[in-house]
Design a protein with these regions (language model features):
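Sec-dependent signal peptide recognition
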Residues: 2-9
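Short non-domain terminal segments
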Residues: 5, 14-15, 274
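Hydrophobic h-region of N-terminal signal peptides that target proteins for export
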Residues: 10-18
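Subset of outer-membrane beta-barrel
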Residues: 19-307
Length: 307
């Protein structure tokens, strides 16, 4: 079984990593945007660290290791040009039956004027452009250290009136807990699915293969310094390297930082998190800031509820 799994993984890696770089050849670019402030603060190097409802985006297999019954996540990204990117998700641990999850991601623009060559100042009409993702996930523990999971997604893209398209995608992931110094490994095939057509051009989904690892650099009591590294190979560009660090103080205050290697614009990232109890319920809130060189910076904030 292990040999067969390694063979399949090797074939997938070969197929994905051997693809030519084709910038501008894929649609639904909003699927590439980090949804979690904690993850974004670590430059997105989060596949082996992700837990709870946020893991539905980074590594659905991870929800099989949830310690709580329910986890709710609400995050928002202040993207460029006034664009908002929202993420809401729920994860449920059903014990021996496995873990289930559902997510909703949307990217919407501000209201824009309809302009034509004859009426460059506007026709009096307005419109919005939006992209949406709805996903259902399932994950299960195969052993006490190995998890497998997957997500089926429905993608809807609305640019303007008749320029609307739908697609379905599949994501599969696996994670392995070494059990020593917090070391974990994870991998994922993301956004594998149907293509969409706008006017006369066909665009594929932004399929990618991700691999990551993490572990504790320092641990003394409840104070931990964690480091992570990841590599992402998209089907429309060169490999991207990610690295992140997190300092946890008494599992209450979290300081994070990260850096992107090989990305055309993204560079450093930083953020902070706070975990606390309110009305007997455990909660956490996070904030991050990411630099995109000449484009400027983006910020994210989010809240997690644990039941």
């Amino acid at each position: 079984m292990l040999k067969k799994s390694l063979l399949i993984t090797g074939l997938i890696n070969t197929l994905i990593f051997s693809q030519y770089e084709r910038p501008g050849s894929t649609a639904a670019q909003f699927l590439k945007i980090d949804v979690s402030p904690a993850a974004a603060a670590m430059a997105g190097s989060y596949i082996s660290i992700a837990t709870g409802a946020d893991a539905l985006y980074y590594n659905p297999a991870a929800i099989a290791s949830m310690s709580q019954k329910f986890n709710l996540s609400f995050n928002q990204t202040n993207w460029f040009a006034g664009i908002k990117h929202d993420y809401s998700a729920i994860a449920f641990n059903a014990g021996r039956a496995g873990s289930f999850g559902a997510l909703l991601t949307r990217l919407v623009t501000d209201e824009m004027k309809v302009r034509t060559p004859m009426q460059p100042d506007g026709t009096g009409e307005t419109f919005y452009a939006g992209s949406y993702r709805i996903g259902l996930a399932y994950a299960r523990k195969m052993t006490d250290r190995v998890n497998f999971g997957g997500t089926i997604n429905y993608i809807f893209i609305s640019l303007f009136r008749e320029f609307k398209q739908e697609a379905t995608t599949l994501e599969l992931s696996a994670s392995y807990d070494v059990g020593v110094r917090g070391m974990k490994f994870a991998m994922k095939i993301g956004n594998f699915g149907s293509s969409v057509k706008f006017v006369n051009e066909i665009y594929e989904m932004p399929t990618n293969f991700s691999f990551g690892f993490s572990g504790n650099l320092f641990s003394r009591g409840a104070n931990i310094v964690l480091a992570s590294g990841s590599i992402i190979k998209p089907n429309d560009g060169p490999p991207i390297g990610l690295t992140g660090f997190e300092y946890s103080m008494n599992q209450m205050v979290f300081l994070r930082g990260g850096y992107n290697f090989g990305h055309s614009t993204a560079t450093w990232s930083t953020g902070v998190g706070l975990k606390f109890k309110l009305a007997g319920r455990q909660m956490s809130t996070d904030y991050s800031m990411n630099d995109f060189s000449a484009l400027g910076t983006t910020s994210r904030y989010g809240i997690n509820l644990h039941f």
